[in-house]
């Protein structure tokens, strides 16, 4: 078991004073079978009115609004989370069971294409080949490895609005793209797949008490009789280094910050993630 502290700070600077802004932050880690949230707080400068709710996908959302003129806005989420090294084992399912109407009806929302995970004949052909040679759980790993083989990890080559196919055409991308491309393959095979946002401590041999530059990260969940997590970017099942925050169909459902404001565009955006292993 690991205990980690994560501080995620996002700062905006506006061209001219924004007279009002309305925002949602998905920055609170989840409590589930492999991780426990000890504490979390989301704070803003300037101070705002806020409230929390759980969205459709089970992600904690902090909604806040600021109705006074402001030229800067900083949102900081501070969390302490305990994580386990291994997830509980899940039952296996056959291709025949995956193709049953009961499964298709139950998981329809995470089987359908989205703007980030569109249908593509080339990718579908890859999925068909993988499904022919692997049982479902191993097919998930094969799909992730295929996506990884097609993309070079190069930050800055894609943006938050890029789809998995955009990254495939460029042959490069970041963790968001690796996850989206993997989901395209999974859904083409009829395997329910979800996008996960969170954090990754970069050091497997992390020193207790040492603060390091962390990473916002993305990976996938697949359902093969039960949900389990796999990281296509690093080609591993997730470990205690991973902290999950949001789950959804794609990036749209888990964007860390989204909102609207009245005023001219932001001239600067600064994001800092710091992670400390506490135990």
UniProtKB/Swiss-Prot annotation:
It comes from the Bacteria. Signal peptide: none annotated. InterPro entries: Bac_transglu_N, Papain-like_cys_pep_sf, Transglutaminase-like. Disulfide bonds: none annotated. To M.tuberculosis Rv2569c. This is Uncharacterized protein ML0607. It comes from Mycobacterium leprae (strain TN).
